[in-house]
Amino acid sequence: MKNRTNPITTNENIADQLKPLPAIIQKFLALDPKRVEFRVRGFDLAEKSHEERLEAIGKAFLRGYNLMLAVRSFAEIDQALAQESDLLRGFFIEGGAMGSALVDSVPFRKPMLPRYLARFGTQFPILVHAGVGLTISKLSWREKGILAELDPFYRWLAYDGRGYHNMYFEPERTLAGPTHKLRGYAARAYDQGAGRGIWFISGASVEKAADTIATMASERRPDLWAGVGLALCYAGPADSREFMAAKKLAGDHAADMATGVALACAARIKDQSLSPEPREGITALWGVTPEALAERVEELRQSIPLSAVADGTGYAAWRKEILHAFTQNSSA
């Protein structure tokens, strides 16, 4: 009689395990990929290549989100992530962050979000924290609990994600005026996300994005342009002509737009996904290579005092330092 040996269960294996939602709840919470198609959303008609890019991004986001409802292990997430292209990996992770936070609203389960943050928060800090914000848009009663789980430095990006969600899914209502009661930097971060949303609803057209921002309150425009800059660089599609057109159309807010570009560039370098497409535009705008810009952005982040990180002002201070760096470059 052959001896039977049981597989060894290690602490690492146990930590890797996740519990899928019941099938009936999965069915209720799952999102149809068609929801991000332009014809369904009613977005402005765009060039075919732009439309295909933005729809592909939305579908990658939903693949990440939907997987979290049924996933059984982080190994399964890693396998799915490996199937995504360099362009789409970050958006898959962003969707997964939304899904993780949403799954945690179901009672009597071991929280998924803290483990998701630990797994992907270092490589994709901006995408993970912004993705969580989309959940807050849907489950405002969970806002306090979710924010408490986030990195205190990047926590503001949850409001960015909330602004993006509202602009993307409720553009007419969001364009009509603020759809929140946020104060202080939370309101600014919200508008940075709304600016990202404007890039999508404008069909990746710098001109249409500029026209949209021009209809909004003047005090909101710096942050809206910052969001456009981030989306232009991270999502695209955009070449050097679009980068320089955005600088021109942003006018007095060009430094804000460039700040968004710098953050997107640093994020792409960090997750090793920067494509040839935006390289020339980044260099034309900033006057340095993408690698040098990403290094500078990281140096500025590390220069923020620990006291500012602890009291929640670090993220705003970081963005301000990036903006000043662009202003100095432009005047040199």
Label every model-predicted segment.
Residues 2-332:
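Mature, well-folded catalytic/scaffold domains that follow N-terminal targeting or propeptide regions
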